[in-house]
């Protein structure tokens, strides 16, 4: 099965066919760095990092570009409030961005271009649009002539006539038409600006991504991605600008993730439920946040609350405990083997699980199903560990496959928070020990007791069941 991608442009799943065999050119819209990013921004960051990881796993060379918008109205306001320059604000929050997403185990982009460091390319694209008759100057501003681009609306599925009828935009006498959008803003007194053939000013938001994608990936790219809120107008405008400037298809596949809601409501400052990723990471394991984000298919809305995060924590712990138990068993292996036929049977099961995982990810990167398959792998690992004798080959294959699944999903299976176990991890091991004793696998039961003893946890077997205390 080839990788299938739901293409927003075509409104259906399509088999992925790269522009060049073995390569993927991918652009993801990055943040405007005037503050810490909110927790909803973390969803596309994690989702499309995982998409990239899977392409890499499948043997593709991925060039992954994600920009920083480091000048716009929000940055200018933040600079005034913080009594800093715009570059100082941008530097502060780009640093904060990397501090936060590094905790989420997000791989570094091939390039993270800043708008302000690529102004020549932006000005050149605007000049090209003017020369081709798609843009016009007006009192120091430059606007894109929307109606001249006949395919406008093809991504969002909106007709120009419908947009005209339903337009709710502030009247601007500088525009020839209310649907025209800004490519270049004339500088206001006291604002940061760049010199250009159109006068001093700075770029509009939409033109930035078009110019950066062209510079770093070329006229046509494989995949352009972002949150569903960017479909219109941002990505629609990007298509218009890029295709008008080059005469070529801008992107072959468009991917968009659904919103993250807080307790069922869309996050917004007006509702008072606006939460930054920075604050969430103060109280939560970033590994759990990543697991949570991947537990629902990226095109479905996802809800964040304490109960759901607790479920994610427990789900991740089950995987971590299975992994750590296998690793411990390998480290203490005494060379016992099962019959060869049984070994082959288990190895065949593992091959089937690997294929199931790939099928899940091939199906529009269905991480929710992939995690279900991951849990099935952990379940079978626990069953195998409960056997009196095991094959070191099978154990190593279990460990290797768990590492493989974790690498694709960007999850960490080692206990990164602390060397100790929390209560739920201890209880899971106690339950496994009870199962081993019921099956008269006393060697495994003693092994679990030893694992807990190493963590300074003492078990007490009573008539009411096994209790534990920390030594």
UniProtKB/Swiss-Prot annotation:
Per its UniProt record, the required cofactor names are: Zn(2+)
Motif 'KMSKS' region: chain residues: 266-270
Q: What is the lineage of its organism?
A: Bacteria, Bacillati, Bacillota, Bacilli, Bacillales
- What protein does this entry describe? Cysteine--tRNA ligase
GO MF entry, a single one: zinc ion binding
Instruction: Give one GO biological process term.
Output: cysteinyl-tRNA aminoacylation
The Gene Ontology CC terms held by the record are: cytoplasm; cytosol
Which reaction is this enzyme known to catalyze?
A: tRNA(Cys) + L-cysteine + ATP = L-cysteinyl-tRNA(Cys) + AMP + diphosphate
* Principal location listed in the UniProt entry: cytoplasm
Gene, per the UniProt record: cysS
UniProtKB keywords = Aminoacyl-tRNA synthetase, ATP-binding, Cytoplasm, Ligase, Metal-binding, Nucleotide-binding, Protein biosynthesis, Zinc
| Residues that bind ATP | 269
Q: How is the cofactor bound?
A: Binds 1 zinc ion per subunit.
Compartments it resides in: Cytoplasm
Q: Which residues form a coiled coil?
A: none
The protein's Enzyme Commission number = 6.1.1.16
Q: Name one Pfam family in it.
A: tRNA-synt_1e
Q: Does the keyword ATP-binding apply?
A: yes
Where do the annotations place Zn(2+) binding? 29, 209, 234, 238
UniProt signal peptide? none
InterPro entries found in the cross-reference section: Cys-tRNA-ligase, Cys-tRNA-synt_Ia_DALR, Cys-tRNA/MSH_ligase, Rossmann-like_a/b/a_fold, tRNA-synt_1_cat_dom, tRNAsynth_Ia_anticodon-bd
The subunit structure is: Monomer.
**NCBIfam families from the xrefs?**
cysS (TIGR00435)
